[in-house]
């Protein structure tokens, strides 16, 4: 039932009792820019500190700048015992024994009101106890270069996940929690954060068919297992290369690309054979952008969007199993079940949002489509406007690489980190400080350790940055929360129970948890502080070329990931189950998308200049891209498809995913559906973001509004940053996100989070320059 931490955001839609905190996985996506009027006034700002400047040397110098302590030796992440792979397996076994003792304590809590009052705290402790090892193991599985460590991490991961699966459907735990929530005195004694945590546990149990008879509960477990297997198969199918298509050399006459295009034509002439072009290859992308003849583009589009019957059947089986699972627990559809604890709440509200967004976006998209039709008309010398087909989009509007809003000097990785640290100091009084890692603390020499330092409270967390590409490391950009915030001084561990010999068995787990606990100034209690890891795959610096120069999309990616990281750092709650990024799926992307908006401000961009010697030019750096609206509209259509596929419709015996997709394209889409295509089998987010694909559009709309209404005029204003931290970031998932947004925007009418609130968000203009393909 539990899923990989690498897709934790996608799993928040089915919050398990013991969820992974995990990481946020984000695929890079094309961004198309729109023209903006940018203020050229650069505000007065705090000078770069020595720590800020040290970040430049840390990340830009290939040798000599790597901070290592020659005198200290420890284990992974500073845990003294984690010095070899066997220690990770041993830690998992110790944690399992300790978790079993705590589980037994919770099960016996009904014997006294004193113990019942501690049930929510103990459930959260149990979740953290298991997740602390599982999330560390998940990071090791995806980043450690040593195969023995990876194998040990797999073993630890599987051992504890098996126990978590038992807890997720444990009727005894459910009954104890029911006893707590049925007691008005106990409920009134819970803090708002504790009560929210209790409700999350309660909903998790109910989604696990906990109150059903044994036969139906077994059916739930069976369906959940089927869904996991089908989901993995679907993702494998989605990434399977499509077969090549045959292209005649004569069809490539007049290619606009004079490099690769000429080489392809010479190859065809030399072999005297048709070219075999694989969809998704560099050659295919070149042809889609450069071939004046429509036929090779059409053939490649058909090949790229083809599916086997088996691939379609796997997807439809997955959708049907999900629908059956939802109906088993008394819900009308999988969307109804999934959206219950989201901002949207119901499928109807998602429809309200998407309909409003469609109404707003359609005029811009149609205008852009008309521009493309005019280009096609001129190209073919036609007397009337032709229809734009799916294979015309890239030829008449070639995708441009993302570019900054104003000309900038080359930005190195270290320079961008310096700018981030300076931005965080302006907004939150928080900065990044390089610190030496001890021998054995990190898993590769590339990894750098940063302290996150608050000007009043000191160290509030740690970021381990593993930023350079290498063999065996997970691809893409990712944010892993290895450890969440949690208050620990009220754990009452002495009450967990014991049996003969258990003291030694649980010692490793106790020592593991004791690391990184701190008493912060001006804050009651002792806290476990957050620890996150950033994984990227940038080019490493070299002696000959110097620091890594980032492309603009890489700068955007880094800002996006650091938005998640600061959410983890500032969302320091007393309960780990609601800390940092552990919030609703349709809210969690807001901080990361908002961070990308800051890159539209010259005042923020000036923070990349440590000495204030560079001059920002007034002239904009890019042209209007008419296809931005088309791409946004296409993403809205995918969100609508996602809702259709998770509605009661899928249980109709005549359900056909291809027919539904084609009908939507022909009735509400911009470009006609192409018979014979079935893109849905490649829409991988249908698994990870099932019934919640709207979330990214939703958070884009909210982030655009927050930027324009709160930050755009003065993005370095400390009062605004403190308001955002106070009203949004510090709560993690412990507060209703609608209340957070309503307070931040001074829009009390949004607080209800009802159908009208969803429609209102749909009417907001998505004013970002952060593209359309979801990072998630």
Swiss-Prot record:
It catalyses: Release of an N-terminal octapeptide as second stage of processing of some proteins imported into the mitochondrion. InterPro entries: M3A_MIP, MetalloPept_cat_dom_sf, Neurolysin/TOP_dom2, Pept_M3A_M3B, Pept_M3A_M3B_dom. Zn(2+) binds at residues 560, 564, 567. Residues 1-38 form a transit peptide. Its EC number is 3.4.24.59. It is found in: Mitochondrion matrix. This is Mitochondrial intermediate peptidase. The gene is OCT1. The active site is at 561. It comes from the Eukaryota. Binds 1 zinc ion. Its cofactor is Zn(2+). GO terms for biological process: peptide metabolic process; protein processing involved in protein targeting to mitochondrion. Its main location: mitochondrion. Keywords: Hydrolase, Metal-binding, Metalloprotease, Mitochondrion, Protease, Transit peptide, Zinc. Cleaves proteins, imported into the mitochondrion, to their mature size. While most mitochondrial precursor proteins are processed to the mature form in one step by mitochondrial processing peptidase (MPP), the sequential cleavage by MIP of an octapeptide after initial processing by MPP is a required step for a subgroup of nuclear-encoded precursor proteins destined for the matrix or the inner membrane. One of its GO terms (cellular component) is mitochondrial matrix. Belongs to the peptidase M3 family. One of its GO terms (molecular function) is metalloendopeptidase activity.
């Amino acid at each position: 039932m539990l899923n990989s931490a690498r897709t934790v955001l996608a799993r928040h839609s089915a919050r398990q009792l013991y969820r992974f905190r995990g990481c946020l996985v984000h695929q890079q996506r094309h961004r198309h820019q729109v023209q903006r009027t940018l203020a050229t006034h650069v505000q007065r700002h705090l000078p770069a500190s020595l720590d800020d400047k040290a970040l430049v040397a840390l990340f830009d110098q290939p040798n000599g700048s790597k901070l290592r302590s020659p005198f200290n030796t420890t284990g992974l992440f500073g845990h003294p015992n984690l010095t070899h792979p066997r220690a990770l397996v041993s830690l998992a076994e110790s944690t399992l024994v300790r978790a079993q003792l705590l589980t037994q304590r919770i099960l016996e809590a009904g014997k006294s009101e004193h113990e019942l009052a501690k049930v929510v705290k103990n459930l959260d402790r149990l979740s953290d106890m298991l997740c602390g090892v599982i999330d560390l193991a998940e990071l090791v599985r995806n980043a450690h270069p040593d195969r023995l460590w990876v194998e040990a991490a797999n073993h630890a991961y599987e051992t504890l996940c098996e126990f978590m699966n038992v807890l997720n459907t444990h009727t005894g735990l459910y009954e104890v929690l029911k006893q707590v929530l049925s007691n008005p005195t106990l409920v009134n004694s819970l803090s708002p954060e504790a009560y929210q945590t209790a409700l999350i546990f309660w909903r998790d149990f109910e989604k696990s068919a906990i109150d059903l008879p044994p036969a139906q509960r077994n059916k739930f477990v069976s369906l959940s297992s089927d869904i996991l297997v089908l989901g993995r198969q679907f993702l494998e199918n989605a990434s399977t290369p499509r077969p090549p298509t045959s292209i005649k050399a004569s069809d490539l006459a007049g290619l606009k690309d004079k490099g690769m295009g000429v080489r392809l034509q010479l190859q065809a002439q030399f072999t005297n054979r048709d070219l075999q072009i694989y969809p998704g290859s560099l050659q295919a992308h070149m042809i889609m952008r450069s071939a004046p003849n429509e036929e090779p583009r059409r053939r490649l589009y058909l090949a790229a969007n083809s599916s086997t019957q088996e691939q379609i059947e796997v997807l439809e089986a997955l959708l049907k199993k999900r629908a059956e699972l939802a109906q088993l627990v008394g819900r009308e559809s999988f969307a109804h079940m999934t959206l219950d604890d989201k901002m949207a709440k119901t499928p109807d509200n998602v429809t309200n949002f998407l309909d409003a967004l469609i109404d707003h976006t359609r005029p811009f998209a149609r205008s852009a489509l008309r521009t493309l039709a005019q280009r096609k008309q001129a190209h073919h010398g036609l007397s009337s406007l032709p229809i734009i087909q799916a294979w015309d989009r890239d030829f008449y509007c070639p995708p441009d690489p993302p570019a900054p809003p104003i000309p900038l000097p080359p930005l190195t990785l270290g320079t961008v980190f310096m700018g981030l640290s300076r931005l965080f100091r302006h907004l939150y009084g928080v900065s990044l400080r390089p610190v030496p890692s001890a021998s054995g603390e990190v898993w590769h020499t590339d990894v750098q350790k940063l302290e996150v330092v608050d000007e009043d409270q000191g160290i509030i967390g740690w970021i381990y940055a593993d930023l350079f590409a290498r063999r065996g490391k997970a691809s893409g950009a990712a944010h892993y929360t290895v450890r969440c915030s949690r208050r620990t001084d009220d754990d009452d561990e002495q009450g967990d129970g014991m049996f003969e010999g258990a003291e030694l068995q649980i010692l490793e787990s106790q020592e593991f948890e004791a690391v990184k606990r701190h008493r912060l100034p001006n804050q009651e209690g002792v806290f476990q502080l957050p620890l996150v890891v950033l994984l990227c795959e940038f080019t490493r610096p070299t002696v000959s070329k110097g620091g890594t120069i980032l492309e603009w999309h890489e700068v955007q990616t880094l800002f996006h990931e650091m938005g998640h990281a600061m959410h983890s750092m500032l969302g320091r709650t007393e309960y780990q189950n609601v800390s940092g990024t552990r919030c609703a799926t349709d809210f969690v992307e807001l901080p990361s998308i908002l961070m990308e908006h800051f890159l539209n401000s010259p005042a923020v961009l000036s923070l990349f200049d440590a000495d204030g010697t560079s001059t920002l030019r007034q002239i904009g750096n890019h042209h209007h891209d008419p296809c931005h609206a088309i791409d946004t509209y296409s993403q809205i259509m995918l969100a609508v498809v996602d809702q259709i596929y998770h509605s009661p419709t899928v249980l109709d015996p005549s359900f056909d995913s291809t027919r539904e997709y084609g009908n939507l394209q022909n009735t509400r889409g911009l470009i006609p559906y192409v018979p014979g295509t079935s893109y849905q089998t490649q829409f991988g987010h249908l698994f990870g973001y099932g019934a919640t694909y709207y979330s990214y559009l939703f958070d884009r709309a909210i982030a655009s509004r927050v930027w324009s209404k709160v930050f755009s005029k003065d993005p370095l204003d400390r009062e605004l940053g403190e308001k955002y931290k106070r009203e949004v970031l510090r709560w993690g998932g412990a507060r209703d996100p609608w209340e957070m947004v309503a307070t931040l925007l001074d829009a009390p009418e949004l607080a209800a989070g009802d159908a009208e609130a969803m429609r209102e968000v749909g009417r907001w203009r998505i004013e970002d320059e952060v593209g359309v393909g979801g990072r998630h």
